[in-house]
């Protein structure tokens, strides 16, 4: 009931997370009520909560700053910058990129692309996240560099894949620390994803 909703909010869950929990519980109650012909009302139906509570607005990175960052990536030319460049022109989530195998990068197709699929060390956020992503611009450059790197590892980014786990938190901390010097305040690696959405709409 509402006490459980208030408990979740008190724990610090943002509105969208509260919504997912409540939806799951609502479905269980609906099933039980239907299956056992119970004469009671589902207490989780019609429950109000602020879905945007605790969610900070994520800003897109302006295109001029994207180009500046991409130029810096090609100048520094190391695996951290390859990951930044890869994300910048694909709209991938950082964890998706960090957990790639080199065999997920298909450069010899008519349209070079990443075949993004779940792996035991890095699942995807949703079933719809499995997709082919075209490689262009900075992301194609990064993919080409990755295909030639780390001959002793199947991973595109070995430093973030150890003990059968992709350490996307470590990647996020390192890359956001570097990125914040070159993008507006409030922008993060995830902002490339929002920028890609805006670029595709333009």
Regions found by a protein language model. Give the residues of each.
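Active-site-proximal segment of tyrosine recombinases
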Residues: 96-98, 187-188, 197, 202
């Amino acid at each position: 009931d509402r006490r459980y909703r208030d408990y979740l909010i008190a724990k610090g869950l943002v509105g969208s997370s509260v919504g997912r929990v409540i939806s799951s519980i609502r479905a269980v109650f609906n099933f039980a009520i239907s299956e056992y012909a119970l004469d009671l009302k589902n207490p989780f139906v019609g429950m109000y909560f602020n879905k945007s509570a605790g969610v900070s607005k994520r800003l897109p990175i302006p295109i001029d700053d994207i180009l500046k960052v991409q130029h810096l990536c090609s100048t520094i030319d190391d695996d951290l910058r390859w990951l930044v460049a890869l994300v910048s022109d694909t709209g991938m989530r950082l964890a998706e990129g960090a957990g790639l195998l080199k065999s997920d990068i298909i450069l010899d197709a008519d349209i070079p692309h990443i075949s993004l699929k779940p792996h035991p060390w890095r699942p995807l956020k949703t079933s719809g996240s499995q997709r082919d992503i075209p490689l262009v611009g900075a992301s194609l450059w990064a993919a080409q560099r990755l295909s030639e790197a780390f001959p002793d590892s199947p991973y595109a980014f070995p430093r973030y894949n150890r003990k059968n786990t992709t350490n996307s938190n470590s990647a996020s901390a390192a890359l956001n620390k570097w990125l914040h010097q070159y993008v507006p305040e409030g922008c993060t690696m995830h902002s490339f994803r929002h920028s890609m959405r805006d670029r595709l709409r333009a």
